[in-house]
Structure formats: structure tokens, C-alpha cells
């Protein structure tokens, strides 16, 4: 009997060793809400300043405008002076490749969403996606936009990838991490469970309950005109969190 019991325990132990480690992320509206994406300067997107060629004194004047966090004010000043901010690239090559795993043109879509967030004050992902459908930065056909819900689909893919382990500075190959889902504590203290096994429900939850957030311009080095190889660029930072209410 002892031999049988020890053998049984050994079998259980072996299975536990071989089984993948899985777990749930906990997010609570009753406490500190950790973001889905907080990549720091790795998550910066670059816009090339075109149109009028600014002299150095003008650039200095633009960069000195407003408070540190008045990114929209500096963007509007560039426009008033005849400049154009045109999406150029993702600042970090690993994050660029990660975003391209969602879609080769997805970085451009995110860039336009960031522009709208700062200039129009829209932060909810669902509202930003609706705005992007009207702008159609990828110039896709109406059938893709409305019948196939292209922009919503791509955004949900991205949010799911973030929730299940994508990070800006780590190479993403489409394979989910050990995270099985979210345990979400709402404002009433109720615990809701969203599992990756039910991807559609999980994706819909993330889409409706996520927002773009503004990080520190000083810490993440964005929101100013910067010169690189004779060209001026203006960076915007991508940070995504869950709604706090």
C-alpha cells in the first residue's frame, strides 16, 4: 500500500512538473489599476514634421510652449505655423515588429488614434475606434470597415495580445503567455472572470473597458520636436489602461 501511495504521489508530482504554469491577472477598480500597456519610451510613435521648414528659433519657441504635459498645445502650434505632423514609424524596432504581427499597417492606425486622443480629447478605445472608422487612415474599402468591422477587429486583437502577454520590448511571436485571463473586481466589489478560452467575450470586455492614457512627457521623452539626421520628429506615447469606473 505504501508503495502504491508513493507511486501515485510520484505520478501526480510528475504531471504537475509537466503541466504549464497558468494564472489570472487581477485588476480592481477598488485599488490601483495597473495598465495593459505601459512601455515607457519603447512605446513611442514618431511623426515627421513636414510642410514648412522651421528655423531653430521657431522650434525652440514651439518646444517651450505651455506646460510639460500640454502636448496638444504644441501640436496645434505646429499646425498654426504651417507644419504638418505625418506618421512616420515606431521608435523601437522590436515594438514595431510586434505591432506588425497584428497587421502590417496597424502602427499607422495606432498613430492616428494617438493624434485623435491628444487633439480631440477622446480616450476610450471604443470611441477612438469609431473616430478612426470615419477618418479611415488606412484608406480601406467601406465594406471592410462596416461589414467586416476591420478597425474594431484589429483593435480587439491588439488588446487581447496585450492582456495575454505582449510587451513592447519583448519579441512577440503570437504565442500566448501563461496568463489564462483576468479576474476583474468592479466598483461594487463583484469579481468577474474573463478567460482566454472564451476569446470573444474577453475581447469585447477589453474593447469596451479600455482607454488610452497620457504618461509623463519627461519620463517617456515625447511631445516635443526633436532633430534626427536633419529631420524634425514629434513623438507620441502609447499607454493603455482599463477604465477606472
Regions from the language model: what does each represent?
Residues 18-19, 29-185:
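Acidic, metal/cofactor-coordinating or nucleic-acid-engaging core segments within structured domains
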Residues 2-9, 13:
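Single conserved hydrophobic/aromatic residue that forms the stacking wall/gate
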Residues 146-245:
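Extended, amphipathic alpha-helical scaffolds
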Residues 12-13, 25, 100, 193:
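Generic recognition of cysteine residues
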Residues 16, 26-28, 36-64, 210-245:
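Compact beta-rich and alpha/beta scaffold cores in large eukaryotic transport/transcription complexes
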Residues 7, 22-28:
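Conserved catalytic cores of phosphodiester-cleaving nucleases, focusing on short active-site segments
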Residues 2, 21-24, 45-46:
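Generic ordered-secondary-structure signal
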